[in-house]
């Protein structure tokens, strides 16, 4: 992970420095970079945190605008099962009558819908990104924060996700549409 995350970031920023290019740069990081809770021993998280630190230092050294996003779990169209989305994996497996594994249905995930991420990227391109500081996994909005965030996310347990997906899968048999309250994931 370190080579892919930190190594690429280092190569990119060194190249920009070499050519005196102070264009804005954005890093797609991960909630795992918090290195707190279940992410405390994450090699992936350490590599993402190293990339963040490199980008933030680059901004201080060059004056370039730096946007570091710590994205939570993404879901929605274009997510790939068994690769980048637990929700996509569950959808795929339930739709294809494959087993799913949930060790603890009470585990809460913070989900970010892909369209909400795209909306934030458009804001960032316009110079209207949402800035913050992080305390562990908690976002603290702050106009001059070092980090950026997507303001629309959804917190839900693994059990709730699986229950809802099973309800959708059962629709042809039950002819019932699951209740989807406003603002739900």
Locations of regions flagged by a protein language model:
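Hydrophobic alpha-helix immediately C-terminal to the catalytic Tyr-X-X-X-Lys motif of short-chain
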Residues: 50, 54-58, 90, 161, ...
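Short, solvent-exposed loop/turn segments at secondary-structure junctions
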Residues: 32-33, 74, 107, 155
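Short-chain dehydrogenase/reductase
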Residues: 2-6, 41-49, 80-84, 111
């Amino acid at each position: 992970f370190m080579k892919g995350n930190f190594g690429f970031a280092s190569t990119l920023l060194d190249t920009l420095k070499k050519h005196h290019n102070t264009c804005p740069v954005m890093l797609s990081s991960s909630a795992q970079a918090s290195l707190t809770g279940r992410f405390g021993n994450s090699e992936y998280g350490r590599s993402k945190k190293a990339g963040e630190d490199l980008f933030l230092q680059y901004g201080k050294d060059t004056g370039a605008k730096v946007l570091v996003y710590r994205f939570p779990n993404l879901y929605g169209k274009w997510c790939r099962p068994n690769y980048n989305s637990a929700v996509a994996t569950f959808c795929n497996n339930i739709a294809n009558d494959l087993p799913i594994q949930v060790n603890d249905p009470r585990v809460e995930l913070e989900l970010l819908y892909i369209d909400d991420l795209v909306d934030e990227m458009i804001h960032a391109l316009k110079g209207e990104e949402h800035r913050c500081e992080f305390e562990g996994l908690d976002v603290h909005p702050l106009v001059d924060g070092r980090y950026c965030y997507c303001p629309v996310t959804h917190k839900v347990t693994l059990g709730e996700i699986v229950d809802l997906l099973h309800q959708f899968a059962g629709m042809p048999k039950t002819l019932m549409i699951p209740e989807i309250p406003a603002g739900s994931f």
